[in-house]
Amino acid sequence: GAEQRHWRYRRRVPLSMNTMPAALIGLPALCCLHETNLDKAGPSSGAAAGPTGMLCPVTHVEEGAMSHYDPLIDSAAARLGRVLEHLGQRVSTAESCTGGGIAEAITRVAGSSQWFETGFVTYANSSKARWLGVEPATLEAHGAVSEPVVLAMAAGAKAAAEADMAVAVSGIAGPDGGSAEKPVGTVWFGWALSDGRVVSECKRFQGGRREVRAQTVLHALERLVSEAEKTAANRSSV
C-alpha cells in the first residue's frame, strides 16, 4: 500500500518537503471517492453522452484516503467467490484501462483458483483483436473505449476461457487521452453472463488515474456479484 511505499523511500533518503519527490508528497493520504448512483441521470443532471448516444453518469469525488476503496474491493471479490463456488461457476476478465486490477483483486481472495479461470490484459488494440476476437473494423469505427468493443471483449473473454461469465473494461483513466466526446474518466463495461446475455454500461468517474482505476475495479466486481446472485436466486426458486 501507500504506507509501505512511503516507508521504503524513507529507508533510503531522509524525508522532508525539500528532498521528497513531488510524486511522493502526501502519498499516504490519497483521494477517497464517493460514488453517487446516477444510472438514470438525464442530461440536466450532469451526465455526459457516450459515443453511442447513451448517457455516461458522472461519479462524483470527495477528498479522503485512497484506502477507502481497498476493503470495498476485497469485500466484493470475496462475495463473488462465495456465490460462484456455490454455483459451481468460473469467471474470466478482459481488462484495458485497469491493467489487470480486477484479476489482481480476485486473486487476493484465498482459494480463488476454484472460481477464477483466466485474466486477459489487452491494452493494445492489436491484443484485443488477437486474444479476444474483437474485429479490427469495430475498433476502427468506434474506438477502443466504446460499447461495441467492450461487448466483444466480454464475449471473447468468456469464449476463449470457456468460463461461465466474464467482465470487460475499457476506459480513459487519464491524466491525458480524453476528448470532448470521451473525457478522462469515461469507462465502458461489458459483462458476458451465464444465461447468454451480454450487457454493457458506461460510467464517468472523477479523480486521478488511481481513483478512476479503483472505481472501475469496484464497479466491475459489484455487477458480477449482482448478476451471480440473481442466478443463484433463480436456481433456488426452481
Language model feature labels by segment:
Residues 7-10, 30, 85:
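Residue-level detector of transmembrane insertion/anchoring sites
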Residues 8-12, 16-18:
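Low-acidity, Ser/Thr- and Arg-rich intrinsically disordered low-complexity segments
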Residues 9, 44-45, 63:
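A general signal for intrinsically disordered, low-complexity N-terminal leader regions
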Residues 16, 44-45, 236-237:
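Serine residues within intrinsically disordered or low-complexity segments
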